[in-house]
Amino acid sequence: VAMILSYAKDITRAYGGNVVRDCVITVPTFATQLEREALLVAAELADMRVLSLIEANTAAALQFGLDRKYEETKVILFYNAGSEAVQASLVEYSTFPDKGGGKNKTVGQFEVKGKGWKKGAGGFAIDLALTELLADGFNKKWNAKKQKGDVRTIPRAMAKIRAAAKKTKEVLSANEKIPVGIPSLHDDIDFSMTLTRPELEKAAAEVLDVATQPIIDALDAANMTVDDIDGVEIIGGGVRVPRVQAVLREFLTERRTNKSDVPELSVHLNGDEAVALGAALHGANV
């Protein structure tokens, strides 16, 4: 981790022209106290001064509220489908009067009311499900020509399959089907098969089945229901999978009392940059 932070510092120096040592580091909601302390030690080894740690969804919520001021209290659900986990946060935005300088004005503020998460339910889990599907497909072709074997025991071949699985997921997020081809995958055998979006969704069914659990946990922690949610903001690479968004819509519709007033899944934020931008904003105000 210290080496990664050192590399990030080198990139900053190369592009910014100055040595940057002060930083704000984002952590997942489920990071333990020991893990956070270890991260601080890693930053010290990288010769960086940590101004603050901030949870990823909180950083995104900060970035979201930068250009918004709600006259009435609003509750926004932040759904973050990353690589390793899914995190959900219920954030309440409001205003308070500020009479500083003799002027009456209102200032925006937010408070995280509830959080939930599910490890092993992110985009990487879908990659693994597709990897298993492709491995099974190759085994059928391989075993039809050779003696019984399992490509999963061949590290080099599996590395190729994992790379193909990731690309397949990305393409099927925008297309209904894709021809997958891996030349000379193993034992001089070329591998090819066509995968469809429904096949991806079936392979990743176990992952998709728990996609909404973090929302349930966040609602329970905040003592709220879906009826209390005024808006939904989705971030993270995992939300690009169409079925993930479909599952979220189905969940919100099913649990909403007024079916004609179900909040849309919004993408006001850049899902890849929002957390980093929010952390930078926090650092500028520490």
Segments (PLM) and residue ranges:
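Oxyanion-binding/catalytic loops of NTP- or PPi-dependent enzymes
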Residues: 3, 12-286
